[in-house]
Amino acid sequence: MSELISSPLREVHQADAIPWMRERGRIDGACAVTSLPDVSEVNMDLAKWRTWFLGAVELVVNAVPDESAALFFQSDIKRDGAWIDKGAMVVRAAEDAGARVLFHKIVARRPPGMLTYGRPGFTHLIAVSRAMKCPEVLPLPDIITDAGELKWIRAMGVRAAGHAVRFAKEQVGAKVIFDPFCGVGTVPAVANALGLDAIGVELSRKRCEQSRALIVNQSEL
C-alpha cells in the first residue's frame, strides 16, 4: 500500500503580532521569515516606531529555537532629510537579543545603476541566529537581482522569498516557516510550495483571508 503524502499545512491567525508572539512563545521546528511594518503602516510617530521595531525584532528572534534562524526583509526609508537604516536596526536588536548575523544580502528593487527617488532601490535580507553557524558557502547570491512577482505592493517578491525559505529548509532544517507580519501571504504560500508548513499572523481581516487563499507555484520561484 502506498503511503499518503499530506499537503503542507498553513495557519493564518488574525491578531496583533506583538501580543500574539508574547503569548505563543517559542515555536518548535520553526524558522522565521518576515518583514516588519514600516512607520507609514502603523499609527505611531518615528520615535515610538523605532522602539516598537526593535522590540518586534527581539520577539521574532525569541519565537524560534536558538539553533534556528530569523530572516528579515527590510527596506530603508528617508525621513526629514535623514536615512533610516532598517538593516542596522535589525542587527542592533538581534544582537541585543543574543543573536548574531549569519548573512546580509541585498535584494534589488530596481535594476542596478538606475536612479531612484523616494524609497531606496534595494532591500536588506538579513539572517540572524543565537546558536546556528552559517556554512562558509551558501547557494544564495550576495545580490538578488530578480525578486520575482510582488503579490502586494508591500510584499516581498516571490523569488526572494523562495531564497529565504530554501535557506530555512536546506540549511536550518526548519519544518515550519513563521511569518508574524504575513500580509497577503507571500511567505506562507512560498513555504507551502516548497513543502513546508507555515504559520502566519496578520492584523487585517481581508489580508488574512487573502493569506489563507494565496497559491504560489514552484515555477514562480
Describe each region flagged by the PLM.
Residues 2-208:
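Core catalytic lobe of class I
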Residues 211-212:
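Conserved SAM-binding loop
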Residues 216, 221:
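Conserved phosphoryl-transfer catalytic core
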